[in-house]
């Protein structure tokens, strides 16, 4: 088949959605399909770098400056879609490219399916401080977007149950997003490599390294991990938290570390190169996440594939992943986080 993936976010933007789309593209191509990505322009990449990636003129989304939305070039996108003779369109966003994908599918009279990635109730706070779109309005917006789809892919049971609650009528199926295991197993990474990274981070061999790796934003709830750290340090002083990643909430976390008096126990690395991700996982004793906004959470799978157990806020998805203590520890209330660590 000739498949068009429509998304507002793709590399070089870093996100779980971008990663899942690249994985999907790679695996579909291995099966013999032709895959074309329709996405937004990005100042860090040549618009015409790859003929299979169609970049539509875009501007930063006012509520998420590191995310973009298309604003013109729609007729050109339709023309290109006709030239590529698409058999099916798979949308990955509810915004500009998602709406464009549905419109093009109807114009070409081909099926359109959609993957629902995001619990928007956790994100509407970014739009005019939650004064324009309230959490209670999300279900109506999503239901309207999905009213004319041929099918919806749910990455987890969490999403499936959420769409049932929204009363989305379209046919739904749970299809988890996989990861490319070889990118994280990495047998060529040696103990010396791990020791060198820990030394670079200022973490000794007898210290426990907790790794948080994600976009640094409010909904990732890294602040809960920071808040739990003083209680942990009262019981065990040799614990260090590494916050790997960048994002709008980074200054707040640095300020929080200072207020809590744990600046010497927290390492902020900023953005790390994708090729170093597995090394960071392997250098850590535990991957930690207090996020309650994940619909699936690829970083959990990446950590486990790297051989690193996780400490995370439990949910329906993780309850089916962490089935043995060797894989990690789940907790269900923020006041239980310190005990879980």
Where are these regions (language model features)?
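Short hydrophobic beta-strand element within catalytic cores of glycosyltransferases
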Residues: 309-312
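Nucleotide-activated donor-binding/catalytic signature segment of Leloir-type glycosyltransferases, i.e.
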Residues: 251-272
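Conserved donor-binding/catalytic core segment of Leloir-type glycosyltransferases
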Residues: 198, 204-220, 226-229, 242
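Conserved acidic donor-binding segment of nucleotide-sugar-dependent glycosyltransferases
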Residues: 324-335
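Aromatic "clamp/platform" in nucleotide-sugar-dependent glycosyltransferases that forms part
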Residues: 292
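N-terminal subdomain of nucleotide-sugar transferases
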Residues: 1-55, 81
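Short alpha-helical donor nucleotide-sugar binding micro-motif in glycosyltransferases
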Residues: 81, 146, 271-272, 279-284
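Donor nucleotide-sugar binding/catalytic pocket of nucleotide-sugar-dependent glycosyltransferases
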Residues: 39, 54-57, 135, 140-193
């Amino acid at each position: 088949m000739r498949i068009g993936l429509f998304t507002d976010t793709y590399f070089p933007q870093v996100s779980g959605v971008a990663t899942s789309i690249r994985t999907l593209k790679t695996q579909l191509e291995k099966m013999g399909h032709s895959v074309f990505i329709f996405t937004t322009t990005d100042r860090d990449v040549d618009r015409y770098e790859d003929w299979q990636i169609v970049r539509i003129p875009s501007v930063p989304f006012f509520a998420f400056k590191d995310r973009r939305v298309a604003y013109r070039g729609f007729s050109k996108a339709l023309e290109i879609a006709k030239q590529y003779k698409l058999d099916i369109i798979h949308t990955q966003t509810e915004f500009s490219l998602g709406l464009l994908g549905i419109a093009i599918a109807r114009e070409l009279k081909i099926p359109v399916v959609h993957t629902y990635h995001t619990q928007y109730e956790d994100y509407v706070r970014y739009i005019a401080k939650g004064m324009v779109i309230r959490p209670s309005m999300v279900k109506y917006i999503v239901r309207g977007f999905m009213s004319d789809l041929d099918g919806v892919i749910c990455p987890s049971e969490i999403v499936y149950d959420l769409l049932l609650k929204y009363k989305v009528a379209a046919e739904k199926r749970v299809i988890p997003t996989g990861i490319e295991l070889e990118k994280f197993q990495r047998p060529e990474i040696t103990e010396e490599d791990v020791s060198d990274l820990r030394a670079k981070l200022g973490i000794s061999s007898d210290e426990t390294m907790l790794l948080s790796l994600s976009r640094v934003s409010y909904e990732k709830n890294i602040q809960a991990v920071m808040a739990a750290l003083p209680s942990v340090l009262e019981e065990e002083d040799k614990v260090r938290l590494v916050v790997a990643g960048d994002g709008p909430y980074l200054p707040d976390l640095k300020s929080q570390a200072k207020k809590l008096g744990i600046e010497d126990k927290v390492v902020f690395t900023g953005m790390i190169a994708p090729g170093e991700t597995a090394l960071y996982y392997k250098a850590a004793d535990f991957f930690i996440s207090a996020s309650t906004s994940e619909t699936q959470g690829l970083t959990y799978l990446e950590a486990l594939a790297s051989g690193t157990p996780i400490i995370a806020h439990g949910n329906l998805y993780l309850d089916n992943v962490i089935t043995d203590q060797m894989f990690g520890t789940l907790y269900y209330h923020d006041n239980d986080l310190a005990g879980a660590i």
